[in-house]
């Protein structure tokens, strides 16, 4: 009887936090990037810029607003040349008012448009948190799916550029914004796939582009407009047998470099990129890795008790991963203070690879 009541109340009072329609982002399947024999190696910023040109050309409902996105093409040039080609009504500079930027996105999305609203750096999301939390993340829930505002919030963060430009407050976002997809790409091909998935859905999401990857080289796919990332499906970046290391975003490169160093001394690491924090690992990919290695580390750039603790709870408690442990699970995270500006001192504040 108790079980039946719990099931009924779950449906009555906990439904519609996320979309339950056929266009729910969770239903959209992976479409992998394709490469030709003449594939170019380009900066990450060139990939996202080329994608935005194709997107604005092909989808007249898409427009963008944010600080410096128009005239100068964004602080990292992702929108370079877009305003010149498509005009000020399609991509518009705003004042320094993050809450207002989000509000513009909510209103236009409710009217059927597909806004990309830019918060210049992840640290500045705090100034829009009340609007994101009270208005956007609750919209489908409090209207029982009756209203939808599929806003895409574009921002950047994690490593680089000191106290105000390199924050990684992922725990804050995870705990405040249930109802919004929290997406943490490791590179710009992944970012493109996440934009396409959101644009194919009827839900909002926040994409946190890796700040230190705009000038890192990537292969340019031939099918940018088609790539999709399946939310809740981690990627195994490196197979191993001794320990599972779970991470995301900018930390993927750090962990991969560290795994290479550990391999040299006989330690085989399996490296897993979660890709999306909300939703998190819907197919138990991390649990299956833990069953093989029996040891696990969760690594990120948030403070202690942040996203690393969230990932640990999901794997050990919700997926019952504790049963397969042969040693204590570990979290690797940043210090509880803000990061230093000097790159030579970043190892004091944030996780870095040895050497």
Name each model-derived stretch.
Residues 300, 308-331:
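Catalytic-face loop-and-helix region of soluble metabolic enzyme cores
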Residues 47-55, 168, 189-205, 213-264, ...:
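Glycine-/acidic-rich phosphate or pyrophosphate-binding loops and their flanking alpha/beta elements
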Residues 3-213:
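Thiamine diphosphate
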Residues 346-355:
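Single conserved hydrophobic/aromatic residue that forms the stacking wall/gate
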Residues 143, 262-267, 318-325:
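Short helix-capping segments at alpha-helix termini
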Residues 268-289:
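Generic long, charged, amphipathic alpha-helical segments
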Residues 81-88, 172-177, 254-272:
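Short helix-loop-beta junction
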């Amino acid at each position: 009887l108790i079980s039946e009541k719990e099931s009924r109340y779950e449906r009555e009072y906990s439904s519609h936090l996320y979309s339950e329609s056929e266009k729910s982002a969770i239903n959209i399947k992976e479409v992998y990037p394709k490469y030709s024999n003449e594939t170019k190696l380009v900066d990450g910023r060139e990939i996202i810029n080329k994608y935005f040109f194709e997107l604005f050309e092909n989808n007249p409902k898409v427009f963008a607003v944010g600080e410096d996105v128009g005239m100068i093409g964004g602080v990292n040039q992702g929108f370079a040349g877009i305003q010149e080609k498509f005009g000020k009504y399609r991509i518009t500079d705003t004042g320094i008012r993050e809450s207002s930027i989000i509000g513009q996105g909510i209103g236009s999305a409710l009217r059927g448009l597909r806004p990309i609203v830019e918060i210049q750096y992840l640290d500045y999301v705090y100034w829009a948190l009340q609007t994101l939390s009270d208005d956007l993340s609750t919209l489908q829930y409090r209207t029982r799916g009756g209203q939808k505002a599929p806003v895409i919030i574009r921002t950047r963060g994690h490593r680089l550029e000191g106290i105000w430009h390199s924050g990684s407050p992922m725990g804050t976002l995870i705990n405040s914004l249930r109802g919004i997809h929290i997406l943490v790409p490791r590179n710009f091909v992944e970012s493109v796939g996440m934009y396409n998935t959101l644009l194919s859905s009827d839900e909002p999401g926040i994409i946190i582009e890796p700040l230190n990857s705009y000038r890192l080289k990537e292969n340019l796919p031939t099918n940018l407009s088609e790539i999709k990332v399946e939310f809740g499906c981690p990627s195994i970046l490196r197979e191993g047998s001794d320990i599972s290391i779970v991470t995301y975003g900018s930390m993927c490169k750090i962990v991969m470099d560290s795994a290479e160093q550990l391999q040299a001394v006989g330690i085989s690491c399996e490296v897993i990129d979660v890709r999306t924090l909300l939703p998190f690992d819907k197919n138990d990919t991390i649990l299956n890795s833990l069953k093989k290695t029996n040891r696990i580390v969760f690594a990120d750039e948030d403070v202690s008790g942040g996203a690393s603790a969230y990932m640990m709870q999901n794997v050990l408690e919700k997926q019952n991963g504790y049963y397969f442990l042969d040693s204590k699970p570990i979290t690797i995270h940043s210090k509880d203070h803000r990061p230093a500006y000097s790159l030579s001192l970043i190892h004091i504040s944030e996780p870095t690879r040895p050497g």
